[in-house]
């Protein structure tokens, strides 16, 4: 999976990813936009402005989605989810300054400028001094005390996916700690640094705790330097049985599903097919399911047709 991801192959577009990108970009726009024309005590301006910014990003993502050859169907009814996720992000920004429950139509120009000033970095690049490890951090916020003095930094990573039930997933916790540790390595005199996953669906914050992960990250980097030939595959339910952008170029998932009897079994499953008939007027088609003929992924028609 990793080797294929480094070969410059086209990714498959996904509705969840497009929604997440639109929400992320709209929040960044809200934090970076010049609102000097908004008076300090002026309220009622943010909801309409925020939705307009989100709509612009939504349409951008829709255009990119439709220009992607490998894509499912765009779901316009997900717009309401995008609005809810953006509002969740704004609620967490309000929480950062102690007014979480404030109705968003009561946000004043002065309050939003205060939040903007606490945003030290928005969509910033994180990279170790040797250039080997890097990442994109959504927000670096200043932590202040009751006197308004800067006492720390907060790495906040916006998440539009499913909210954790009890704790952060191991990989997400590791990702957030790597952001923290790169930041500390590059800024040895930094104040206290903490990191959180900000889940926009329900505006909940989840702290990442644990030891420094840079040594492990360097070991992983060394082990995954791209090679001319693919690495040994890790075949199993956690890879071949789940979501993967690279199935179109990998024979292993297909053979794995065929061998364990799960090929063509579920309502939502990937398949290799022959297109036997296609009506361009109606979009209807007749497909013939294929099975792997060998370990290299050569397709063998089964005679089973679906329309």
Segment roles from a protein language model:
Residues 1-35, 51, 246:
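Nuclease catalytic cores
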Residues 26-120:
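A non-catalytic, helix-rich entry segment at domain boundaries
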Residues 112-221:
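Mg2+/Mn2+-dependent nuclease catalytic core
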Residues 213-245:
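Polybasic (Lys/Arg-rich)
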